């Protein structure tokens, strides 16, 4: 039987349908309020508003749960590879062996970008941020696929594969251009993560051998960042896509949103904070500064809009960080890791942070891993974009397959 919530406005009662969720909180359907009650709902930042129905990702922030298509994120990070998770997000189920092989072959086949795109990079000054370069390059793919202004359902999967395949190539090209090195072409004998590391660190005169521990760590990082419900960048992609815009242009809007320091740039801020603290002996001083409302200092890497418990992604990354530093001989002498571990231990015992449910989030350890890998801080958000492109394309595809889809138009 249908359930309803009652809304009383100026003495008149309106019955609002309660939509049952397959898991998690139920939802009150307010779509008819403006037409029937002659008023709108007001919810800055969409704190309590669902903008769509989705079966891709589920989060229970109070319990620290993150699932993709029903699979726990920790299981996926430990037992899957990134393209297997990409297939899961896009198609709704894990691939068979044959499906996985076909999918990875298609991704490899589309990893090259048009040679004319190389000229675009030459228009940027040498000091340009890699995110600025990547944003422009991804948006320019719209010019190479102009027919996608009139895309059909048959185009959804190929478009997703093309975007997933080309984003690491463009990301590596953005980095190479920013440091004045020649572009390295994809090597389809390597898997997705190996190929990206190869394009990042190889040169025409120096062969780069991928360390398997580094590869596995980056694979986990990509999986952990693949999707996260209707966050700022995902919502941006959906809003742009709702107008029927070219999908490559839609992804470029997601990259722009992700670039913001409150979204994708937080792990770089964590590194800067740990450097500012400088030594474990100064942690109490900075804890006090974080509690002081009049002090501009903020404890980065703690707290999350959704999670009111330990971010499950942070738990995986903490152990991954230790594995990487042990492999590189830095486990016992990496000052940033030592500060991070002690800062976390002190904060988790402090009533101020406990009462406010401020726990380490996914950004707290990822920057330390990137830095140990030799990835510069200006590339941190670029790597986030590589991973999140999978989620963006899955959400974009789901949106266009939704019969209730309308152009987004907030009031």
UniProtKB/Swiss-Prot annotation:
Gene Ontology, cellular component aspect: cytoplasm
InterPro entries reported in the protein's UniProt record: Citrate_synth-like_lrg_a-sub, Citrate_synth-like_sm_a-sub, Citrate_synthase, Citrate_synthase_AS, Citrate_synthase_bac-typ, Citrate_synthase_sf, Citrate_synthase_typ-I
Gene Ontology biological-process entries: tricarboxylic acid cycle
EC number, as in UniProt: 2.3.3.16
SUPFAM superfamilies referenced in this protein's UniProt entry, alphabetically: Citrate synthase
UniProt pathway annotation: Carbohydrate metabolism; tricarboxylic acid cycle; isocitrate from oxaloacetate: step 1/2
NCBIfam families documented for this protein: cit_synth_I, PRK05614.1
Protein name: Citrate synthase
Chain's gene name: gltA
